[in-house]
């Protein structure tokens, strides 16, 4: 259940009552269908299927009435005969709840708490204690400004800047904290920005005007050292810039902020203040290393993301410090778990420098219990009893490595976000969360039926940790809007944490608000040293072309590749993904197989999973392998189709995209749902025209018909025809392929690069650091509430997770 922000208007109830008066028989027939299914939860498609049945038997008026809007926006219905309660979501982030008594035909509006209490009765009525712990974070956020339009969700920093600049514009006294903020800047004992010669805003403005006049007479490239002494006498310290030109820009920005603040100027100025010198990135679970780890348990995309992230972040920090005229060396630490039984990886080394960086290291800290260090790997679902001690130990190790405290901490996934919360609370630093995936949304009804899952997954711990970390974070970044607030018809991952219940444990009536300005969309890119356009001939890895040709054309049928391509002059339609039901590779193969026009125009090559069922231990993958073999036989795909087993060499995969581009082919991402779509970004970065699912992140990455194409995997025939149309057009006009390829690249360069990501992240860290300071947003009340919840609930739940036992040596 995902239920959230309650819009307390009676409109939904009114619509139900109006329909009851106007179409009593049809509505009773519909509600009776729901009730006849017995106690349970109805999903949106169940709700609408029953409506279709009523419509086909004469309930036309019901379909045309106002009640249709209610049912179309219903996210679930709870059936407890004779009652049906419906959670209605008119738009992202806004919820209402109604309950209908089918026998009495009465309608009532429910509060979040009432709805959740009713839902709990599904669990055999065993949790009927009237005194259940309810968590409500809304009162703590009453003073925090927030937008109310769904389109504003995920643009938190823009909203915050508008709010801050308007306060400063209306009330000049609100500029005082900015003065204090600039005067309080120090790093390793060095004063930056302003010294104590400047005690008032008036003095600051006159000094800035004097500095502006002085700098305007100097060449723009004059080094700071040539006027540093004069500036210091006036009260200005290092940190304004490395040259007269850059310092003058900064002074103009601050003068504008002091005279007539606007959101853009404020953000630019705050983003340029030297605030971030040392960063900690927390990612405890899995085998975190740089080599021989991908494919090990709990070890995949998150590690690739973080390694690309920190390389870009270090480059940005070095560049900013140079521009700020500071000679400090930045440092980034990735704090993860040290695993003595490292399975041939480097995960048993305490410190490891990240390749391609100068100042970024993996710092590994072991999990400990009363028996000492835990030696073996444990699942991400079993880490909860170790995290508190891990955070304490990590704090000491971080202090030793940095010779002080970090300025900024980034948590990753549920465990990393909880540890980041503990560390940021202890150190008083700005915290950013990245979820990567929120497990609650992956397992339907894992909240209401949590006891079913708890022995294996310990979701009671994980959901509790998620709520604590979300509310403790200063800001949260996501890759897409849908991750926060879903779409018109689907609930966002964060949105599903706004209201839910774990019967017998606690009830969340207001957990997180998707309208909170802490949410920001900052999309990652692809590593441009690996993924770059096919046209950049000098950088191409031509030495790999022989092995790639074998991969695609070698006639031998083995466990690395099966199938063959008779006509190599045809373009290649390409896809690469895990072989599971959601990624829908077999769906793509079937759509291709059934479309004679597409088969005539292109060959199909897919990289996915194993082609031998004996090699897989995953039931879902085995089913997909069997389905793929069946499709090859049924549709006689030999000669037009090649199936290559999963490839983990990223450098070779990058060249494979470009190799496909050389054939004037295209990339397809056919998933039923894709949270972000990194392969879409990789393919577009290599210059491949891309067709990708409309369900999830790719719908935001691609502008349909401009930088690529959206396809709906639930309508495979339409998708296949769209792809065939593209290749027919390319056949008639080869320049069409080049145009789509170039527009795809343009889209990437505008929005989806690690450089854009790191610039944005550093700016956010500056703005939220300032916001925390000027509004005194230490959130003391919230933090006390969270502390109580952590100690009284999370710690007790963590004790229920069995401790791992190392095998005797």
UniProtKB/Swiss-Prot annotation:
Keyword annotations from UniProtKB, A to Z: Glycosyltransferase, Transferase
Return the EC number.
2.4.1.13
> Carries keyword Transferase?
yes
Q: Where does tissue-level expression of this protein occur? A: Predominantly expressed in the leaf tissues and in caryopses.
Source organism's superkingdom? Eukaryota
Q: Which residues form a coiled coil?
A: none
User: Region (GT-B glycosyltransferase) spans which residues?
Assistant: 275-753
Gene3D superfamilies in alphabetical order:
1.20.120.1230, 3.10.450.330, Glycogen Phosphorylase B
Q: Which GO terms describe its biological process?
A: sucrose metabolic process
Reactions catalysed: an NDP-alpha-D-glucose + D-fructose = a ribonucleoside 5'-diphosphate + sucrose + H(+)
- Tell me a Gene Ontology molecular-function term this record carries: sucrose synthase activity
Matching entries from PANTHER family are given as: PTHR45839, SUCROSE SYNTHASE 3 (PTHR45839:SF13)
Q: Which family does it belong to?
A: Belongs to the glycosyltransferase 1 family. Plant sucrose synthase subfamily.
What does the record give as the function of this protein? Sucrose-cleaving enzyme that provides UDP-glucose and fructose for various metabolic pathways.
Q: What is this protein called?
A: Sucrose synthase 4
Give the organism, scientific name. Answer: Oryza sativa subsp. japonica (Rice)
The coding gene here is: SUS4
């Amino acid at each position: 259940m995902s239920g959230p922000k309650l819009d307390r208007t009676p409109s939904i109830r009114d619509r139900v009552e109006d329909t009851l008066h106007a179409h009593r028989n049809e509505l009773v027939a519909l509600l009776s269908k729901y009730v006849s299914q017995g106690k349970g939860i109805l999903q949106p498609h169940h709700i609408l299927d029953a409506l279709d049945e009523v419509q086909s038997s004469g309930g036309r008026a019901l379909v045309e009435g106002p009640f249709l809007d209610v049912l179309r926006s219903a996210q679930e219905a709870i059936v407890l005969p004779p009652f049906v309660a419906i959670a209605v979501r008119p738009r992202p982030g806004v919820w209402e709840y109604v309950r209908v008594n089918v026998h009495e035909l009465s309608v009532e509006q429910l509060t979040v708490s009432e709805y959740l209490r009713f839902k709990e009765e599904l669990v055999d009525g065993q949790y009927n204690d009237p005194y259940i712990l309810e968590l409500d974070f809304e009162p703590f956020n009453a003073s925090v400004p927030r937008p109310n339009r769904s389109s504003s969700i995920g643009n938190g920093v823009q909203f915050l800047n508008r709010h801050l600049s308007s306060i400063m514009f209306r009330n000049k006294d609100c500029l005082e904290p900015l003065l204090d903020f600039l005067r309080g800047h120090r790093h390793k004992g060095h004063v930056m920005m302003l010294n104590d010669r400047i005690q008032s805003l008036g003095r600051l403005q006159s000094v800035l005007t004097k500095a502006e006049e002085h700098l305007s007479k100097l060449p723009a490239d004059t080094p700071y050292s040539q006027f540093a002494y004069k500036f210091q006498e006036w009260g200005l310290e290092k940190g304004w810039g490395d040259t007269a030109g850059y310092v003058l820009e900064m002074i103009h920005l601050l003068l504008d902020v002091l005279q007539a603040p606007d959101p853009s100027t404020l953000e630019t100025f705050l983003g340029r203040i030297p605030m971030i010198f040392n960063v900690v990135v927390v990612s405890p679970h899995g085998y975190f290393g740089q080599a021989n780890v991908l494919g090990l348990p709990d070890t995949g995309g998150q590690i690739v993301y973080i390694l690309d992230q920190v390389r870009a972040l270090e480059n940005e920090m070095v560049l900013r410090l140079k521009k700020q005229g500071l000679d400090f060396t930045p440092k980034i630490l990735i704090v993860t778990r040290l695993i003595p039984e490292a399975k041939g990886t480097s995960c048993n080394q305490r410190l490891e420098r990240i390749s391609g960086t100068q100042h970024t290291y993996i710092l590994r800290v072991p999990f400990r219990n009363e028996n000492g260090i835990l030696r073996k790997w444990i699942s991400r679902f079993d880490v909860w009893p170790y995290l508190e001690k891990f955070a304490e130990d990590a704090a000491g190790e971080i202090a030793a490595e940095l010779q002080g405290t970090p300025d900024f901490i980034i948590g990753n996934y549920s465990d990393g976000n909880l540890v980041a919360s503990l560390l940021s609370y202890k150190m008083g630093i700005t915290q950013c969360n990245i979820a990567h995936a929120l497990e609650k949304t992956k397992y339907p009804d894992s909240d209401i039926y949590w006891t079913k899952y708890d022995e294996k997954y310990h979701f009671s711990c994980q959901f509790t940790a998620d709520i604590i970390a979300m509310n403790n974070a200063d800001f949260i970044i996501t890759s897409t809007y849908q991750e926060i607030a879903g779409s018109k018809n689907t609930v966002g991952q964060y949105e599903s944490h706004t209201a839910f219940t774990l019967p017998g444990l606690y009830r969340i009536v207001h957990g997180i608000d998707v309208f909170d300005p802490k949410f920001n969309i900052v999309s990652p890119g692809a590593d441009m040293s690996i993924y770059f356009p096919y046209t950049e001939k000098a950088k191409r890895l031509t030495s790999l072309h022989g092995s790639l040709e074998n991969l695609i054309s070698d006639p031998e049928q083995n466990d690395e590749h099966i199938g063959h391509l008779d006509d190599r002059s045809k373009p290649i339609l390409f896809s690469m993904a895990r072989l599971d039901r959601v990624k829908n590779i077999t769906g793509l193969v079937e759509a291709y197989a059934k479309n004679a026009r597409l088969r005539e125009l292109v060959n199909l090559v897919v990289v996915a999973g194993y082609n031998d069922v004996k090699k897989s231990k995953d039931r879902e993958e085995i089913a997909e392998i069997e389905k793929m073999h069946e499709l090859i036989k049924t549709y006689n795909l030999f000669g037009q189709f090649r199936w290559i087993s999963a490839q983990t060499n990223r450098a070779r995969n990058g060249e494979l995209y470009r190799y496909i581009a050389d054939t004037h082919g295209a990339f397809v991402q056919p998933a039923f749902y894709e949270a972000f779509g990194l392969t879409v970004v990789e393919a577009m970065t290599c210059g491949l025209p891309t067709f990708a699912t409309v369900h999830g992140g790719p719908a935001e990455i691609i502008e349909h018909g401009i930088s690529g194409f959206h396809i709906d995997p639930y309508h495979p025939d339409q998708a296949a025809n769209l792809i065939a149309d593209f290749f027919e057009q390319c056949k008639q006009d080869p320049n069409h392929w080049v145009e789509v390829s170039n527009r795809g690249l343009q889209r990437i360069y505008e929005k989806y690069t690690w450089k854009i990501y790191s610039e944005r992240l550093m700016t956010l860290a500056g703005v939220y650091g300032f916001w925390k300071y000027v509004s005194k947003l230490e959130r003391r009340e919230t933090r006390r509430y969270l502390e109580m919840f952590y100690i009284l609930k999370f710690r007790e739940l963590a004790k229920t997770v069995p401790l791992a036992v190392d095998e005797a040596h």
